[in-house]
Regions:
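Rossmann-like NAD(P)-binding element
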Residues: 45-47, 51-96
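Rossmann-fold NAD(P)-binding glycine/threonine-rich loop
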Residues: 90-137
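Hydrophobic Val/Ile/Leu positions in short beta-strands of Rossmann-like dinucleotide-binding domains
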Residues: 5-6, 64, 147
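NAD(P)+-binding Rossmann beta1-loop-alpha1 motif at the extreme N-terminus of oxidoreductases
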Residues: 1-39, 43
Length: 207
């Protein structure tokens, strides 16, 4: 059985872990607050384990499911990510929550790749709201999962992971496309307030 190591114990971590457990993956939560991690693991059941950041990583894939503002504090303490597939599920929202912290033409995912050059970074899960991930569908339809990556093996691994966990994976191309995916996620967040959808809407490509 493959294992997924998820960094974080918040709503996004819960969503990805829920889908992973349902698909038969082993799940390891890597956390700074061990009590919070254990509480989530208890709710998820199915042998979900909890480790602290800096401890052994058991997952074949590592997922960053923490606020973007915490990434720089967490990446180095995580330890060696050499050769690992690292999913960036973050959105680089600025401290004032008025927009993206990145400059035009750059992305949080590429900044993470620079912080962890030995890892193979894949952008994924940042455009799907956590509640929808827990539900695993929207109006009876699979959720669209947009991904971007440079490393082909990592791309293939995340496509397989996404499909096995019930998503319809849409490959957008190179990691540089993360800038577009992060802008799309920010727009989707803003629409929650103008449309009153309470973070329950989903982005979908209608073929």
């Amino acid at each position: 059985m493959s294992t997924i190591s998820i960094v974080g114990a918040g709503n996004v971590a819960r969503g990805i872990a829920t889908r992973s457990v349902a698909a038969g993956y082993g799940v390891q939560l890597l956390v700074r607050d061990e009590a919070k991690g254990k509480a989530l693991a208890s709710q998820l059941g199915n042998g979900v384990t909890v480790g602290t950041i800096g401890g052994p990583i058991t997952g074949d894939i590592v997922v960053l499911a923490i606020p973007y503002s915490a990434v720089s504090e967490v990446i180095r303490p995580l330890g060696s990510l050499s050769g690992r597939t690292l999913i960036d599920a973050t959105n680089p929202i600025n401290a004032e929550s008025t927009g993206l912290a990145t400059t035009p033409g750059t992305s949080g995912a590429e900044a993470i790749a620079a912080l962890a050059p030995e890892a193979h970074v894949v952008k994924a899960f940042n455009t799907v709201f956590a509640g929808n991930m827990v539900a695993g569908q929207k109006n009876g339809q699979p959720l669209d999962l947009f991904i971007a990556a440079d490393d082909e093996a990592a791309r293939t691994a995340v496509i397989a992971f996404g499909e096995k966990t019930g998503f319809r994976v849409i490959d957008t191309g190179a990691l540089s496309q993360s800038a577009t995916l992060e802008a799309l996620a920010w727009l989707h967040m803003q629409l929650q307030f103008t449309r009153g959808t309470n973070f329950a809407s989903a982005i979908a490509i209608i073929d």
